[in-house]
């Protein structure tokens, strides 16, 4: 009989495949899921609530982007909290237009994504006035919903890994306004006891 192994829980905003999960992989390595439970949360508010309720030991929060500055909803919640910063990581952010298999750019009528992702791709979107822009709570969740609905006239803006996770097709790549786009994430805990050992 094998002994149960404790795995600390880190919550992040978004669905699996979100850039926050990519940041966890960068911070802890590609085998992160072997040693840590990664818990998706639908909103920043839910993220801070889950740690306040003791349902996660850590949360990973996007705090600043090189193109758009502060991720203000996350910053506001962090500043109101008494959480300690126990780790930090910055990752490159590459945005892709992801649709259902067989989707082609000429047929896309609507694009959805998190407002921060949309803001980082404003030049691409401004050049496509025929495309309706739909803000959502999450980049990865947007891809999941587009694929689930099966509407080839809708696409989402998200990271490459989401296409792999949800069975989408990358229609256009590198939509961000600048190739050096990156986001800084903070690993937060209720106490300043350091990041988990993995």
State the predicted function of each range.
Residues 1-198:
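Domain-level signature for soluble enzymes in the chorismate/prephenate branch of the shikimate pathway
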